[in-house]
Amino acid sequence: MKTTITLITAMLLLLTTGEDALRAQTDVPPAGARYGVKSAIIKKSFYGPGGDREITIYIDDYGAREAEEDRMGKHQSLRIRNEKDKTEVVVDFSERTVNIGGWESKRQINYRHLKLGELERYGLTEAGTKVLLGKTCRVYKQNTWLKSYMVTVTHYVWEGINLKSDLKYDEVPGWEEREEVKSIQVNVDVPQEKFQIPRGFKVKDWRGR
């Protein structure tokens, strides 16, 4: 009896794994999709002069909805971007406040549909590839101004998703910010509360001002 149960369990596991693999192979992004995967949960750590942070990114509907959860000590915030209604919501859990503003995806670098002319406009140069947690990323170098400093940023992009960015201040040796990707889950169920405004928070809507 025990052997039979073990065989059944093994067969169910094999079927489940096969279904996941088939879904990943047949999941074709719609035309113009921001990202090449339907959903994802990405966890990474940030290290910089201003303090270390833990970041979790939630992606749904090929990037039409995206949320970035940021934790630094006791402070927690959530930034929600919705491409459909062109909004960006910033939730501060410490202050229990919500700020709603406009957001246009065209202001962000769309790596999946990056055109040759945009490389120059954004100050990007292609710098080969690198594998992060089994994902082959396109590497881009970017020279840009951050406040009054010239910085060099290295972006690691997979399926249009900027998995990590490392930043170095050109004029301040040793002063840098870097990210480390901890885990990548693809085509998973994303908690829908990550895209919702918490109840009981003070809401400020800045749109149209």
Summary of predicted features, one role per range:
Residues 11-63, 186-209:
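N-terminal leader/targeting segments and the immediate start of mature chains
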Residues 42-47, 65-71, 138-145, 164-170:
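Short beta-strand segments that buttress and anchor functional surface loops
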Residues 28-37, 111-164, 201-206:
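Extended beta-strand-rich segments in extracellular/periplasmic secretory proteins, especially
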Residues 34-39, 57-67, 79-87, 135, ...:
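Short, solvent-exposed coil/turn segments at beta-strand boundaries
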Residues 156-209:
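Signal peptide-directed secreted proteins
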Residues 2-8, 20:
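Sec-dependent signal peptide recognition
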